[in-house]
Amino acid sequence: MKTFFLTSMLSLWAAFTCVCAEASNADDGADLRLLNRIDFTPLLTTSGQPAEADFALIAAAGYDRVIFLAFTNHPKAVGHEDHIVRELGLQFIHIPVEWESPKLSDFNTFAAVMQTQGSGRTLVHCEVNFRASVFGFLYQVLFGGAELDAAMSLMHSIWVPNDTWEAFIARVMTDNGVDYQPL
């Protein structure tokens, strides 16, 4: 009886150890190297343009969708990014945002996509993570419950928005009922 009990306990322990080892070996994306990467939350990451080979790593890291905020003619753009991403089983959303004149409608489209496309893991990117970090900052503050200073600190870790983008931030905040004074 003691032998049966001991054998059963060892079998359970071995099974538990295997399950834990498999879970700890899952790719959470922590080693994924993306230009100017910001992890606003475990479900929202922003970055600069990934290389073509990075998209397979992004999929393996458990991302469900990619939102691209730049234009396809920038120097580091990946040709047919939409096809590459979709072939990997991820959603691809392209919201081209003019660098010199971001529009309130651009952010509203982004926020609507974030809210209606499920709660999966999302990578938002542009050319160098300036547009994307602003959108990530705004989304987290307005819809994600983040404190303004904490989200801003993350954005400022890669850049301080210029006058155009600071005015855009103020316009989006005001439109959403938040009193925000540009820097």
Which residues are covered by each model-predicted region?
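Positively charged n-region of N-terminal signal peptides that target proteins for export
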Residues: 1-4
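Glycine-rich nucleophile elbow surrounding the catalytic serine of serine-hydrolase chemistry
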Residues: 130-134
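Bacterial N-terminal signal peptides
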Residues: 7-17
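Cys-dependent protein tyrosine phosphatase-like superfamily
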Residues: 20-122, 135-183
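Short, surface-exposed ligand- or partner-binding patches at beta-edge/loop junctions that are enriched
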Residues: 125
